[in-house]
Amino acid sequence: MQRFLILFLLTTACLGAQGQQLDPNDYIYPLRELKQRLYSANFGEIRPGHFHAGVDIKTDAEEGKPVVAAADGYVSRVVLQAGGYGRAVYLTLHNGTTVVYGHLRRFRDDIERHVRRERYERRSNGVNLWFGPGTWPVKQGDVVAYSGDSGSSGGPHLHYEIRDTETQRLYNPVREGIIRPRDEYPPRIVRLHYVEVDTVQGVPVRSVPESYAVVRT
């Protein structure tokens, strides 16, 4: 009975961690005027002190690409800071998720003007502004900003996140099928690493790892 209970708890925990599965048809690609759709960093990559919370989309090594609303919703937050995401826009969508666009060059004109006014009134270089549904509603495809290289960024790109609005749980845009990377090249094995394993305990034993090059004939 105890073993069954443990198995049940583990199973329900795993199922709960999966959460809602998003519908890729609810979203469009967040960038326009690209020569090709490529991304440079994946979800969950190890970063200093944290895991990467989204995907980084290439912008042809250029700034100023139009960033558009992935779905209907409204601009709920605008951030301007020296580090982190730099200039960032948060869109709360009607489908229950929030998308984040980071490292922007500039916001669209009306938002840019509002941010400038707030900076002068607050006498601050950075701002963190929140808005309700009636301030800046957006339709799918509306331009909200332009891509850039602001904040803690190593080159022009768009940082793209999807979160559950209520819980702030992160979704992997690639696993959810919202960002579809091109994968035209089969994997190629170039080396094999050999480590002896205890056949009873299933753990590596104290042996010197061996490495072998794979040669195609």
Please give the residue ranges for each predicted region.
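Surface-exposed, glycine-biased beta-strand/turn segments
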Residues: 17-88, 92-95, 125-127, 131-134, ...
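Sec-dependent N-terminal signal peptides
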Residues: 4-13
